[in-house]
């Protein structure tokens, strides 16, 4: 279960990639703007400020996140973004830190590019840190007993969850889009006693928490702390540097030449 409060513990850090993504979306006006994977809606509200005349459509797979978004006044619905289809007046589609949960997201991007009208925009940001020490530590601990038998059904993501940026660039160029694709590694300066643990508790550890009872969950966290501390040692000033790679995809539909 996704916990909006835990997720928002690092809201400022998590928000920066969203704004970096939107800065490259060139739609001056929009009739309908869609946020797929809207989370608790704290960033969706910006879409209404950026395009004040647009209808804002929002969707998330988590009922808890949708409830939090509705509390912020967002007209959000619970649903699977794989089943979403654009309405004829959709001018901007945004998906921030959500599509990496969908193994077939490349197919989705191509489908959207084919369904949206020329001149529409797609903006996507996905984490690209699945080989990072934090994920490696979680996988290593999950292979140990007593956790292995409890967590063996979790498809811990490893390898090419998110493709290299050139994959998305070539794919969307071939589909006739004008593309702007890049990657950035943010060096987050975190504070607190166990900041990396608290960060991943709101994301990577969600499926682990769902399968462990309270006692096993607390034990798992306690055993994970030294692994994360070794991987991300705190500085003398008390801060912890947490590198986080992200991949950005911006495409203007029908503005390029499709491959022959």
Curated annotation (Swiss-Prot):
A GO biological-process term: methylation
Documented EC number(s): 2.1.1.144
A single GO cellular-component term on record: cytoplasm
Main localization, broad class: cytoplasm
S-adenosyl-L-methionine found in the keyword field: yes
Reaction catalysis annotation: trans-aconitate + S-adenosyl-L-methionine = (E)-3-(methoxycarbonyl)pent-2-enedioate + S-adenosyl-L-homocysteine
Broad class of enzyme this protein falls into: transferase
Disulfide bonds: none
CDD domains, alphabetized: AdoMet_MTases (cd02440)
Annotated localization: Cytoplasm
Entry's Gene Ontology molecular function annotations: trans-aconitate 2-methyltransferase activity
Any Pfam family the entry gives: Methyltransf_23
Keywords: Cytoplasm, Methyltransferase, S-adenosyl-L-methionine, Transferase
Matching InterPro entries: SAM-dependent_MTases_sf, Trans-aconitate_MeTrfase, Trans_acon_MeTrfase_C
Function: Catalyzes the S-adenosylmethionine monomethyl esterification of trans-aconitate.
NCBIfam families: PRK14103.1 (NF010703)
Sequence similarity: Belongs to the methyltransferase superfamily. Tam family.
Record protein name field: Trans-aconitate 2-methyltransferase
Organism, as annotated: Mycobacterium avium (strain 104)
């Amino acid at each position: 279960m996704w916990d909006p409060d835990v997720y928002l513990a690092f809201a400022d850090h998590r928000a920066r990639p969203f704004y970096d993504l939107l800065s490259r979306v060139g739609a001056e006006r929009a009739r309908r703007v869609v946020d797929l994977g809207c989370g608790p809606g704290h960033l969706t509200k910006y879409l209404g400020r950026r395009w004040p005349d647009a209808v804002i459509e929002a969707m998330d797979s988590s009922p808890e996140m949708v409830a939090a978004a509705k509390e912020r006044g967002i007209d959000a619905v619970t649903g699977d973004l794989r089943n979403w289809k654009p309405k004829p007046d959709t001018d901007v589609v945004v998906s921030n830190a959500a599509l990496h949960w969908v193994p077939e997201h490349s197919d989705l991007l191509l489908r959207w590019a084919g369904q949206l009208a020329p001149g529409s925009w797609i903006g996507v940001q996905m984490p690209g840190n699945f080989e990072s020490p934090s994920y490696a530590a979680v996988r290593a601990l999950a292979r140990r007993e007593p956790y292995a038998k409890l967590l063996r059904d979790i498809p811990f993501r490893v390898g090419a969850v998110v493709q290299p940026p050139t994959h998305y660039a070539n794919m969307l160029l071939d589909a006739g889009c004008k593309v702007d694709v890049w990657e950035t590694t943010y060096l987050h300066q975190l504070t607190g006693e166990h900041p990396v643990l608290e960060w991943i508790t709101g994301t990577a550890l969600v499926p682990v928490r769902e399968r462990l009872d309270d006692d096993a969950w607390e034990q798992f966290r306690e055993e994970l702390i030294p692994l994360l501390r070794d991987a991300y040692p705190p500085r003398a000033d008390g801060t912890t540097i947490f590198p986080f790679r992200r991949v950005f995809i911006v495409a203007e539909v029908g503005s390029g030449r499709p491959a022959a």
